[in-house]
Swiss-Prot record:
UniProt xrefs under NCBIfam families: uS13_bact (TIGR03631)
Cited HAMAP family: Ribosomal_uS13
Record carries keyword Lipid biosynthesis: no
Official protein name in the record: Small ribosomal subunit protein uS13
Quaternary state and interactors: Part of the 30S ribosomal subunit. Forms a loose heterodimer with protein S19. Forms two bridges to the 50S subunit in the 70S ribosome.
């Protein structure tokens, strides 16, 4: 297995798909990394030479990926919550922050339904 940016890239996949195992690298960025490194993106990872892998490591190193990206996203969300702006409040309450309806739906953000308390007489 090839190791790039601290992630084991699956050997059986094409380079373009294999690079998407790195957090912060999707299909488009993966293809652009391969083109910039001069590596054929349809080639399997196991068929890459050490020189090709080194070029890919160098190109991936130019982007914010994995732990640094996760930390950056977390800090951005924390900043919004500290500001107390609308998006920060919605993050804090665990509700959708992009204007979706919440009377029905929004189950992914809100979590499983809780049983309603029965009123005492």
């Amino acid at each position: 297995m090839a190791r790039i940016a601290g992630v084991n890239i699956p050997n059986h996949q094409h380079t373009e798909i294999g690079l998407t195992a790195i957090f912060g690298v999707g299909r488009t960025r993966s293809r652009s990394i391969c083109v910039a490194a001069g590596v054929d993106f349809s080639k399997k990872v196991k068929d890459l030479t050490d020189a090709d892998l080194e070029k890919l490591r160098e190109e991936v190193g130019k982007f914010v990926v994995e732990g640094d990206l996760r930390r950056e996203v977390t800090m951005n969300i924390k900043r919004l919550m500290d500001l107390g702006c609308y998006r920060g409040v919605r993050h804090r309450k665990g509700l959708p922050m992009r204007g979706q309806r919440t009377r029905t739906n929004a189950r992914t953000r809100k979590g499983p339904r809780r049983a309603a308390q029965a009123l005492k007489k």
